[in-house]
């Protein structure tokens, strides 16, 4: 579901670019905005109680935190705030590079929680699916962080 949100949002932004909205003239910027939409959606789960959303809620996410990490509930709130800050950073051109790099690091740091949850038998995305998704999110964040160079002449820049 999360991957679908990322892909659809990216395609919608790129379509807007094709229709003349200059902000979304490249795939890179459209993907940055698509990732921001995805992050707003996933971050919302960090703050809602059970039964409010079809996605995992705060308690579900706290259960995913490995035992060696202190204050699991607080860590869930913190990562939610970081995801929201990253989303804002991605849509602002002046902060996109820093946001992309920081989000890539965040995605790397969060991967052990997904591995722990899968190995602990929690109801989470299977690792064979989650690890490639996480690699994709890291790649898009780093792609968004890339600065445009003079040699960039195609619409993928």
What are these regions (language model features)?
Residues 1-157:
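Membrane-interface extramembranous regions
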């Amino acid at each position: 579901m999360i991957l679908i949100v990322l892909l659809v949002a990216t395609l919608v932004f790129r379509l807007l670019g094709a229709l003349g909205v200059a902000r979304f003239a490249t795939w890179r910027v459209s993907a940055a905005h698509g990732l921001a939409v995805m992050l707003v959606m996933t971050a919302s789960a960090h703050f809602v109680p059970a039964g409010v959303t079809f996605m995992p809620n705060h308690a579900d996410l706290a259960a995913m935190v490995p035992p060696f990490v202190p204050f699991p509930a607080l860590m869930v709130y913190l990562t939610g705030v970081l995801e929201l800050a990253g989303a804002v950073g991605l849509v602002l051109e002046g902060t996109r590079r820093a946001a992309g790099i920081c989000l890539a690091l965040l995605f790397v740091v969060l991967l052990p929680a997904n591995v722990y949850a899968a190995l602990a038998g929690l109801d989470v995305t299977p690792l064979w699916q989650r690890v490639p998704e996480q690699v994709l999110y890291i790649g898009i964040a780093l792609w968004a962080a890339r600065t445009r160079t003079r040699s960039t002449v195609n619409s993928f820049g």
